[in-house]
């Protein structure tokens, strides 16, 4: 009888994947990133173990957005106090807080648990083409 192999956290082998966002659609990039961070592309995927790869996104500010999302889409924050709702347009977030925008969007695609937060820490986003992880990168997507 064959048994399913369950991966232990000590047996996980992680790769560093580089994604160039220039000219690619924002949402398509993020679905690929969420899959890589979760580890679902690996045959040894185990849902209760963080078996995903490290992902480095470069040229994040050069991603494409379809339609009029840059002017219309808004992100809301609330501190919990009355009247403290703040909103920022997608275009402003892309200019000023590119890294935060990508992490916020990917966070919605990952599990809402401590495991999901652990996966999100493996995402590195850079607005330009320069990044400090050149030595670690061993794959390009």
Curated annotation (Swiss-Prot):
Q: Name one Pfam family in it.
A: Ribosomal_L13
Look up the record and give one Gene Ontology term from the biological process aspect: translation
Keyword Ribosomal protein among UniProt keywords: yes
The UniProt keywords, alphabetically, are:
Ribonucleoprotein, Ribosomal protein
Instruction: Specify the domain of life of the species encoding this protein.
Output: Bacteria
Asked whether the UniProt record includes Ribosomal protein among its keywords, one would answer yes
Note the Gene3D superfamilies from the entry: Ribosomal protein L13 (3.90.1180.10)
Which GO cellular component terms, listed alphabetically, does the Swiss-Prot or TrEMBL entry include?
cytosolic large ribosomal subunit
> In the record, what terms sit under GO molecular function?
mRNA binding; structural constituent of ribosome
What does the similarity note say? Belongs to the universal ribosomal protein uL13 family.
Question: What is the documented function of this protein?
Answer: This protein is one of the early assembly proteins of the 50S ribosomal subunit, although it is not seen to bind rRNA by itself. It is important during the early stages of 50S assembly.
* Assembly description: Part of the 50S ribosomal subunit.
HAMAP family named among the record's database cross-references: Ribosomal_uL13
Quote the protein name from its UniProt record.
Answer: Large ribosomal subunit protein uL13
Organism of origin is Sulfurovum sp. (strain NBC37-1)
Query: What gene is this protein a product of?
Result: rplM
